[in-house]
Amino acid sequence: PGLGPVGDRYRPSQSLRSLFNMSDPTRACIKLPLGIHNTSSRRHLEPHSVPSAPVISHWLQSVVDADPRFARAYPLRLLPEYASLAFSAGEPSSRAALGLEGELAAIWRSTIAKRLVEGEQAIPLNALAQWEPDGMPFIHPWVELHGLQPWLEATLATVILPVWHMLAAHGIGLEAHGQNSLLVVRNGWPQALMLRDFHDSVEYVREYLPSDIPEPDFGPRQGLYSRAPDNQFYRMSGPEALRELVMDTLFIYNLSELALVLQEAYGFDERRFWRQVHRLLASYGAQQPALRPRLAKLGWDKPLIRTESLLRRKLETDAASTSHQVPNALTAEAPSALKPI
């Protein structure tokens, strides 16, 4: 006979692998491997990333703590991964044992409740593009309360600028898609951006890191990352890879859905939406003259940008390329809007 249920009760989140503690919401969220393909990825836990999760979280938190702008101008709250456990096949190992790597693992992440103050809520960013059973958008009560344009301006600034500042000022790309990102609101008004899930969704370029930010220190496992070629783990070959990560996850496969909802529900033209985003990013650059050379290396406003082909990657696992070029709606004179393909 089985042992039966033991300990706290957990409930899976929309991302499936992350479990919330329902018995005590102040306790950690646990991320577990899952043997499915969802979007473009197999949802196990990459073996190398599990023991590295606390290192990456500590590295990111140190960057946030050292820059007061993440507290004032670009409010950013992280949900750090502070502990992990994984099966390692060791050497020598059988094929069966190797197959268990990434399938028997767990990562402990700080809970959302500990990052909120009284009166605040944390809303998954992809909820902003959802429709309710009454035929109105999820965001409609907030739009009615605050007005569409004021609410949108505040939301775009709150969601975009922390990620953009981390990229432009600190040389770190974050995978800020709709499940990893949460909008902290008070009565529907944006307060801060909350980010999670860093163990396999952070990228940097050695030459693009400022001189005061060292590469993450993986301790006794440093050799694994030092010997690995660029683009295999966290270290990328150039700023273009960081731009693609951020613009893919934040704009093309995230905010584009909000733009569509605003157009369908309120007649807010999609091209106007992206012009507003362009002005926000241009204003950031104007306010940060020292960062202009770094922003130029990103090429965020060039007419064509490269983006990941999620469907091709899922259906054609042996495809020679899983990316393609699309018109950039953030160029000064964009002919059309960004569209996920």
Residue ranges and their predicted role:
Residues R11-S15, W164-H165, L174-G178:
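Short amphipathic alpha-helical surface micro-motifs
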Residues L156-I172:
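An amphipathic, hydrophobic-aromatic interaction surface with interspersed Lys/Arg
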Residues P1-T158, V185-I341:
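Nucleotide/phosphate-binding site architecture used for ATP/NTP-dependent chemistry
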Residues H170-V184:
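A short glycine-rich, hydrophobically flanked beta-strand micro-motif that places a catalytic Asp/Glu
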